[in-house]
């Protein structure tokens, strides 16, 4: 049989097979569409069951809307027993929601439970200019606030007596009311339950002892105050910082008024709301050396030299600025005749230490000369020299060492590649040596920036505990609190005593003058509170 004959016999058989194939394809298409429809129905029913379960067993605080009975039409094709169970669950959920709605709202008015706290202090206030011959006591209004003393929380009751005319037919004296009550003392937080000592403790625990909110809340719970939340504590913190910001602005002006400051910067993680990740931002520190005032400054996390430049321009800073080798300072002030840059000998020394393994003779020579410079400083310290005497001694002994070091670097520096450790150390030191020699000009100037670095360390320690700031505003608030606490440390002021008093006073100083606020900064405040000055121990 030829090939053509075989094909002629097969062709009649192909047509029925093609028809069957087309029919099966149509069936598959219909079944696929039906399956997709059923899957969609299952998702809808699953969502409805989950919604009903949340109403019945979930948290009521989500305030979900009451179930619309019309939504149950989706269950029309279900088995009767399943539909009946869902309907019963719906009725039970609606009933429970209705019963608990009002009750829950009432309970939420004050979630913080203070019943276990003792009442240790009562302040009874009587109206001014009270004529007891005309008025009689008719009641009192009691305000309860939570105060703190180390190891204990307690209630302070502010009792305001209410007095009314003895005789209803009497007329109150001119300018007075028929019912008298003492005015409510101003509190740090309007209608808040947190007293000044509790608020100061929250600030101290967070930025002096580096304790995050959740640990504080656990501690306060152990002391008898239940139901505190991180959002509540953070709200108290923010309102307290708002009270302190006028003080912070005065402190900033006082620091920048000085003619000798040290500056440094450190990183602080700040949460980015868009990426939900903590970004590395920068916090600046400026320290007025002679006045021992400390300022932390946050400007959207920038490390650009423009930050410190704008700060100096705003307050018309004139004087010496001592800093590490960060190029941003030099860029910011190289054209400013009012700012004389002084660098840090410790940073120079560190670079030579790093070169010890590579080129010990060269590195040891540089380190030995730097050691001689510090021996001269120790000699001046031991002799208790005044700034003028120190300046004279430096010019007698230190200047020739500094000049010899510069000549040595000019001669030896060209022999080593900038890629070598010793080459890097010489380049780093030489490019900053003229600025470094300025410490010979004034006996007040220090050879290094160590004091500034010491102010940064508490920030570093805190970073390991509270981890990050929630946003830029939180970082600015941190700068406010840390500035006041650092200044307290520099003046040996008890920070708890200081904050207790200042937070109590600030509600009365919302319109205070610059000079009035200046008297509330730690270095001035301690003059009228000698009992709060801590004695240094050796």
Identify the role of each PLM range.
Residues 1-193, 234, 262-263, 397-398, ...:
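Short, flexible loop/hinge motifs at secondary-structure junctions
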Residues 22, 127, 162-164, 169-538:
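Catalytic center-proximal scaffold of phosphoryl-transfer enzymes
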């Amino acid at each position: 049989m030829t090939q053509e004959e075989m094909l002629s016999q097969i062709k009649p058989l192909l047509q029925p097979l093609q028809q069957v194939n087309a029919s099966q394809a149509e069936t598959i298409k219909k079944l696929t569409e039906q399956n997709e429809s059923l899957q969609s129905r299952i998702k809808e029913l699953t969502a409805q069951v989950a919604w009903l379960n949340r109403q019945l067993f979930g948290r009521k605080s989500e305030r979900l809307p009451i179930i619309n009975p019309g939504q149950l039409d989706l269950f029309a094709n279900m088995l009767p027993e399943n539909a009946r169970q869902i309907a019963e669950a719906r009725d039970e959920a609606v009933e429970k929601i209705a019963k608990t709605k009002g009750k829950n709202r009432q309970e939420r008015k004050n979630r913080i439970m203070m019943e276990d706290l003792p009442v240790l202090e009562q302040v009874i206030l009587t109206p001014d200019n009270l004529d007891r011959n005309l008025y009689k006591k008719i009641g009192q209004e009691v305000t309860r606030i939570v105060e703190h003393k180390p190891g204990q929380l307690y209630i302070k009751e502010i009792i305001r007596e209410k007095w009314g005319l003895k005789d209803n037919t009497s007329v109150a004296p001119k300018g007075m009311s028929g019912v008298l009550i003492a005015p409510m003392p101003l509190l740090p937080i309007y209608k808040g339950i947190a007293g000044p000592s509790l608020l100061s403790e929250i600030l101290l625990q967070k930025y002096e002892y580096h304790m995050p909110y959740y640990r504080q809340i656990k501690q306060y719970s152990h002391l008898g105050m239940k139901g505190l939340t991180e959002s509540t504590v953070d709200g108290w913190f923010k309102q307290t910082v708002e009270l302190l910001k006028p003080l912070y602005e005065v402190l900033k002006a006082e620091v920048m008024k000085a003619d000798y400051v040290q500056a440094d910067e450190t990183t602080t993680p700040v949460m980015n709301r868009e990426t939900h990740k903590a970004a590395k931002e920068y916090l600046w520190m400026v320290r007025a050396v002679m006045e021992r005032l400390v300022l932390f400054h946050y400007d959207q996390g920038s490390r650009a030299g423009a930050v410190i430049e704008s700060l100096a321009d705003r307050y018309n800073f004139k004087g010496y600025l001592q800093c590490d080798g960060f190029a941003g300072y030099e860029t910011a002030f190289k054209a400013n005749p009012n700012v004389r840059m002084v660098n840090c000998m410790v940073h120079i020394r560190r670079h030579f230490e790093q070169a010890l393994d590579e080129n010990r003779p060269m590195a040891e020579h540089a380190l030995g000369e730097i050691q001689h410079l510090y021996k001269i400083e120790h000699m001046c310290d031991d002799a208790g020299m005044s700034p003028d005497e120190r300046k004279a001694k430096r010019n007698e002994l230190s200047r020739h060492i500094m000049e010899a070091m510069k000549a040595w670097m000019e001669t030896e520096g060209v022999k080593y590649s900038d890629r070598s450790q010793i080459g890097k150390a010489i380049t780093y030191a030489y490019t900053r040596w003229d600025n470094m020699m300025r410490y010979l000009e004034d006996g007040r100037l220090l050879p290094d920036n160590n004091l500034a670095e010491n102010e940064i360390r508490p920030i570093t320690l805190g970073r390991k505990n509270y981890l990050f700031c929630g946003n830029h505003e939180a970082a600015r608030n941190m700068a406010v609190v840390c500035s006041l606490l650092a200044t307290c440390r520099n003046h040996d002021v008890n920070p708890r005593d200081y904050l207790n008093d200042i937070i109590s006073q600030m509600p009365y100083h919302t319109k205070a003058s610059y000079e009035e606020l200046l008297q509330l900064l730690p270095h001035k405040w301690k003059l009228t509170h000698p009992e709060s000055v801590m004695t240094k121990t050796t």
